[in-house]
Amino acid sequence: MNAWEVNFDGLVGLTHHYAGLSFGNEASTRHRFQVSNPRLAAKQGLLKMKTLADAGFPQAVIPPHERPFIPVLRQLGFSGSDEQVLEKVARQAPHWLSSVSSASPMWVANAATIAPSADTLDGKVHLTVANLNNKFHRSLEAPVTESLLKAIFNDEEKFSVHSALPQVALLGDEGAANHNRLGGHYGEPGMQLFVYGREEGNDTRPSRYPARQTREASEAVARLNQVNPQQVIFAQQNPDVIDQGVFHNDVIAVSNRQVLFCHQQAFARQSQLLANLRARVNGFMAIEVPATQVSVSDAVSTYLFNSQLLSRDDGSMMLVLPQECREHAGVWGYLNELLAADNPISELKVFDLRESMANGGGPACLRLRVVLTEEERRAVNPAVMMNDTLFNALNDWVDRYYRDRLTAADLADPQLLREGREALDVLSQLLNLGSVYPFQREGGGNG
């Protein structure tokens, strides 16, 4: 059956700021306390979406979350009106204010793990929300992510959206950023490659930075998504590269159809894994980048592998890269050699995503890949699909509500909270989402 990959991109939120919240993500740590530009960040993301949509790649949008997220501050013991809660936390524990104001939901590669209908036992598209248990600021995302996904994939006959796994370290799940699908045409059954960093009873794990994904979580997600057990491979990421800042697999590998583009040191027991994929995926092609050409450090600093590998109708592929790749002589030299070599990659497309990149999120972090048949695509909430009208409406919305300068101190401004809620109210109507945000269901929550 014919099917297409639709990229659902996260829209950057109004409180996008640099707080260094993500230990193990070296860009996040390095840019801590710098001044951010939320308006520019949102527009950079929108331009990527629209450019790819115009090039013929189906594209949709996932909206930001409510931030600062007052209900969690109340759980932490701060009381009074919303304004009083903000004032108290800013004075007594500003680190909590930064955490509950993170715009990290923009990186929707961590929102959920997807199983297309061609891979599932019941013939539905399955989406399991990620619990993002390893980082407090990200662990807050799952309930609203679930509401948003149910508002977008709202036809229960075609889509099953599953709640996140229990919030415990043993079941740490980071979503599609640790998941690849390999195979032929999108509508054919594919091989799902789940990548984990640690498992109970296995001493092979990183020592410097945390391994966020567990094998136990990956196995549970595969079950929830009803993936045919014959179409699943579990593989461990190389713990040494996690210790070099590869906090998700999509920082060191990206797949599309029959191609796996990865670093030579991406996986534990890599030659064994690639042999397994060759045996089980027709036409499988591994493009392994040697460490002698691109070091892990350079891969992390440029986000070479946090790229999007997109298929054209003629079978050729386009690699979507952040500008940092073009600015690095060694990486750009390698990429031009890659273009000349015998493989499906025939074009490099570069985007300026500096605002997201400075927090450790490249092109692949910003998108959730969902393979859909034509019938399934028609069943998606049409208001989220990118086109000229939506692009213009979202740009106008960003111009109206987003600030062009934000520091950590600004997060305590009650006006920022009010601006954010008004903006999301308008956006949820624009995207026909219903009341997906807690403040909408609580009537504002200003008392």
From Swiss-Prot:
Active site, renumbered: 174, 248, 365
Pfam families: AstB
InterPro entries: AstB_sf, SuccinylArg_d-Hdrlase_AstB
Keywords, ordered alphabetically: Arginine metabolism, Hydrolase
Complexes and interactors: Homodimer.
Family: Belongs to the succinylarginine dihydrolase family.
Protein name: N-succinylarginine dihydrolase
Organism of origin: Shigella sonnei (strain Ss046)
Gene: astB
